[in-house]
């Protein structure tokens, strides 16, 4: 048996061992993921690359602290420093979006939307949202999601001829179904939202108006997209995507009564202890988004998206609604005789990361699809500009045109050639170097 003196002198590696020493398998996985992010061109519209400061905050000792409740009103002691972090996050979010109230505790986009439902609706109430097949989101009433199981979802859609939302039809539908809540926002809609008209429609039927700006919040923060905050009763957003922060949620409102309901819905309604390390990282990201260079970043996202869309159109690809006014686009692959799943795999093999996506009135199943969704936030963060995105568009077209001529959905020679050129591009724009 070792003596107590020997125990006291034994190094305590729990506080000193590196990840590589403590868990080499996970360390290798992280190293591999860093390599993937460095050497591939990230075109998934919902992804971005955070700053080293955000990484540092999220990996901090604040992960150790439980803090049920809100700043100054916690159920645990020792919360003085996490109170500082959460208060900074709240105040910065309010300043960034011009809102009077902000809740920074939602752990995810799904939970932030669930909190609004819990705060403003009763099970069985009717609400309206954009159909998932037309560019909406699972949490806006998909039958497989809680929002579609616990509530009555009435979906509006887009016109067949131009793939745009018909606001007159939204008004007619609202008058017919008398929803308690109307949601604007989605995951694959590339054109502006008429927030003023949506609010007028909501008011005409006595409904709340909610905007889920998860995808375009960074563009709102950067001043290149209209803000929904002056029009909506409540606005939700994730803190990653175009906002370029850690993965999480944020709820904004200018109504004090709604703010109180939202706070109660988050805690104790849906969540217990908030993730204080993530909230600290949110605060860092909000500060970054308040800087003048973030406006330049947001402007570049949109310019790059338009350049990518126009390049693809120039190579014979159809873009849903004819183009984009934000950070994303849907590519209709049907004229090329391609499917989304096959196209996604070919592009990933070529170093171009994207996702298959349904298009409006898509005849294919969700795991097949007739489209691709492409976005520019992550690669814009790296420093790619219009010239580089024109190159990216040409590379995408080269791969897909080759795959369209292949009977087995692959073009190894072209894919390998494109992958080398992708590597040359990404080497010019390193991350975390």
UniProtKB/Swiss-Prot annotation:
Annotated site (Plays an important role in substrate specificity): 240
GO molecular function terms attached to this record: glycine hydroxymethyltransferase activity; pyridoxal phosphate binding
UniProt EC number: 2.1.2.1
SUPFAM superfamilies assigned to the protein according to its UniProt record, in alphabetical order: PLP-dependent transferases
Keywords from the named record: Amino-acid biosynthesis, Cytoplasm, One-carbon metabolism, Pyridoxal phosphate, Transferase
Subcellular location: Cytoplasm
GO cellular component: cytosol
Residue numbers carrying N6-(pyridoxal phosphate)lysine: 241
Binding locations of (6S)-5,6,7,8-tetrahydrofolate: 132, 136-138
Reactions accelerated catalytically: (6R)-5,10-methylene-5,6,7,8-tetrahydrofolate + glycine + H2O = (6S)-5,6,7,8-tetrahydrofolate + L-serine
Gene Ontology biological-process entries: glycine biosynthetic process from serine; tetrahydrofolate interconversion
Catalytic class of the enzyme: transferase
Cofactor needs: pyridoxal 5'-phosphate
Assigned protein family: Belongs to the SHMT family.
Function: Catalyzes the reversible interconversion of serine and glycine with tetrahydrofolate (THF) serving as the one-carbon carrier. This reaction serves as the major source of one-carbon groups required for the biosynthesis of purines, thymidylate, methionine, and other important biomolecules. Also exhibits THF-independent aldolase activity toward beta-hydroxyamino acids, producing glycine and aldehydes, via a retro-aldol mechanism.
Complexes and interactors: Homodimer.
NCBIfam families: PRK00011.1
Name of the protein described by the UniProt record: Serine hydroxymethyltransferase
């Amino acid at each position: 048996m070792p003596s107590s003196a020997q125990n006291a002198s034994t190094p305590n590696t729990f506080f000193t061992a590196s990840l590589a020493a403590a868990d080499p398998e996970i360390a290798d996985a992280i190293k591999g993921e860093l390599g993937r992010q460095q050497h591939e061109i990230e075109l998934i519209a919902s992804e971005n690359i955070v700053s080293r400061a955000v990484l540092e905050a999220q990996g901090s000792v604040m992960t150790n602290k439980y803090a049920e409740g809100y700043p100054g009103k916690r159920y645990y002691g020792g919360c003085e420093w996490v109170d500082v972090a959460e208060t900074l996050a709240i105040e910065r979010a309010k300043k960034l979006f011009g809102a009077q109230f902000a809740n920074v505790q939602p752990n995810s986009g799904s939970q932030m939307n669930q909190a609004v439902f819990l705060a403003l609706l009763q099970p069985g109430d009717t609400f309206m949202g954009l159909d998932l097949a037309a560019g909406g989101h699972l949490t806006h009433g998909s039958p497989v999601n809680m929002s579609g199981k616990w509530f009555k979802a009435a979906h509006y859609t887009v016109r067949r001829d131009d793939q745009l939302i018909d606001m007159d039809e939204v008004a007619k539908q609202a008058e017919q179904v008398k929803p308690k809540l109307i949601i604007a926002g989605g995951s694959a809609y590339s054109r502006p939202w008429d927030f003023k008209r949506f609010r007028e429609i909501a008011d005409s039927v006595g409904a709340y108006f909610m905007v889920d700006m998860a995808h375009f919040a960074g563009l709102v923060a950067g001043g290149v997209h209209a803000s929904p905050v002056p029009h909506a009763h409540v606005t939700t957003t994730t803190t990653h995507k175009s906002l370029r922060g850690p993965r999480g949620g944020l709820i904004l409102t200018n109504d004090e009564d709604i703010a109180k309901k939202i706070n109660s819905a988050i805690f104790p309604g849906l969540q217990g202890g908030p993730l204080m390390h993530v909230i600290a990282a949110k605060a860092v990201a909000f500060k970054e988004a308040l800087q003048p260079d973030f406006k330049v970043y947001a402007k570049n996202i949109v310019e790059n998206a338009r350049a990518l869309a126009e390049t693809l159109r120039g190579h014979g690809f159809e873009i849903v609604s004819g183009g984009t006014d934000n950070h994303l686009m849907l590519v209709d692959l049907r004229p090329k005789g391609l499917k989304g799943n096959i196209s996604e795999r070919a592009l990933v093999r070529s170093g171009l990361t994207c996702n298959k996506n349904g298009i409006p009135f898509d005849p294919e199943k969700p795991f097949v699809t007739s489209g691709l969704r492409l976005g520019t936030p992550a690669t814009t963060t790296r420093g790619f500009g219009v010239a580089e995105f024109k190159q990216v568009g040409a590379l995408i077209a080269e791969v897909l045109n080759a795959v369209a001529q292949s009977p087995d959905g692959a073009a190894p020679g072209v894919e390998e050639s494109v992958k080398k050129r992708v590597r040359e591009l990404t080497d010019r724009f390193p991350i975390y170097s």
